[in-house]
Amino acid sequence: MGKRRCVPPLEPKLAAGCCGVKKPKLSGSGTHSHGNQSTTVPGSSSGPLQNHQHVDSSSGRENVSDLTLGPGNSPITRMNPASGALSPLPRPNGTANTTKNLVVTAEMCCYCFDVLYCHLYGFPQPRLPRFTNDPYPLFVTWKTGRDKRLRGCIGTFSAMNLHSGLREYTLTSALKDSRFPPLTREELPKLFCSVSLLTNFEDASDYLDWEVGVHGIRIEFINEKGVKRTATYLPEVAKEQDWDQIQTIDSLLRKGGFKAPITSEFRKTIKLTRYRSEKVTISYAEYIASRQHCFQNGTLHAPPLYNHYS
């Protein structure tokens, strides 16, 4: 059994990209080309990015990149990203009536869209949202198209107040994921946004002391050059890739920059921390429909005088 931690066992403000598997090489289990969510968090190389240390999930450097959206748009010409009011939206993780104790909400994704939209169009940033501002480790993920291809995913294992944390990692994941070019205005209608809040950090007894589809994992290991590295996958990654525990660990080692042959003895040297997450995803179409619904029902302030699709 794992030993429960109250807080993540990471350095202050360490961020990590946990989504998007790009052709990982697995030891003795074939190759898997595209993944929906993956991330690596090395523990000692490059410098800080936007006041936080980030980890690039493709290179294993300590410059992070990380976390979704769908096609379609409504014929709306005005909206107010500064408002923060929302209409009913999809429940977190697609559940029905079991989310009353969850912190994560669809409004958080809408706020991320507000922040990104205002940045791309050069408008003032939206006013503070109405959801809780409690501190949580968090990730923001962007995906695109009908097949929901990863477009950016970055987050932090340090607990951040949600208002400032989501604002920061919205832009970091959209514009500074080293695996992708920055998001553009033209891509907005095809985007999906996901917000993941990380909870229940526990020290695992060994590298197999976790469950696929339940736990996210963060591993710490010493590479072939004697340098400490870390890497992480969010809880959904292994299940989406149809990986077992060994495949997941081996993929994560490669994402963390380990280049030597992976043996069963080496896997036993890994220090593993497991965690869970609350996640919600909405599409750009749902975001626009929500904002329009609120405006029509008088719950938004007067919309700004600009064309949303100009």
From Swiss-Prot:
Domain AMMECR1: 97-291
Entry-annotated residues carrying Phosphoserine: 74
Pfam families, A to Z: AMMECR1
NCBIfam families reported in the protein's UniProt record: TIGR00296 family protein
Protein name, as recorded: AMMECR1-like protein
InterPro entries from the UniProt entry: AMMECR1 (IPR023473), AMMECR1_dom_sf (IPR036071), AMMECR1_domain (IPR002733), AMMECR1_N (IPR027485)
GO cellular component, one term: nucleus
Compositionally biased region (Polar residues): 28-66
Keyword flag Phosphoprotein: yes
Keywords for the protein's UniProt record, in alphabetical order: Phosphoprotein
Region of interest (Disordered), residue spans: 26-95
Gene from which this protein is expressed: AMMECR1L
